[in-house]
């Protein structure tokens, strides 16, 4: 069974990194309403687009999602 996207993303946290995945991980870590228990691309993508308390480049999110699927 695949880890939730949130669980995988938390393994990518690195406050000293300028990599998009590390930046997103740190932003999501501080967002208390991020959907933590899902691996549904549409749900997470819509959340980032419409509800997140931060803005993030969705093109970069798509690339991060591909990395998530590869692990």
From Swiss-Prot:
This is UPF0346 protein SPy_0467/M5005_Spy0383. It comes from the Bacteria. It comes from Streptococcus pyogenes serotype M1. InterPro entries: UPF0346, YozE_SAM-like, YozE_SAM-like_sf. Belongs to the UPF0346 family.
């Amino acid at each position: 069974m695949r880890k939730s996207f949130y669980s995988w993303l938390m393994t990518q946290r690195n406050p000293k990194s300028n990599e998009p995945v590390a930046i997103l991980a740190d932003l999501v870590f501080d967002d208390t309403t991020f959907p933590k228990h899902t691996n549904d691309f549409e749900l997470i993508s819509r959340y980032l687009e419409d509800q997140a308390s931060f803005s993030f480049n969705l093109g970069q999110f798509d690339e991060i999602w591909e990395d998530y699927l590869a692990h």
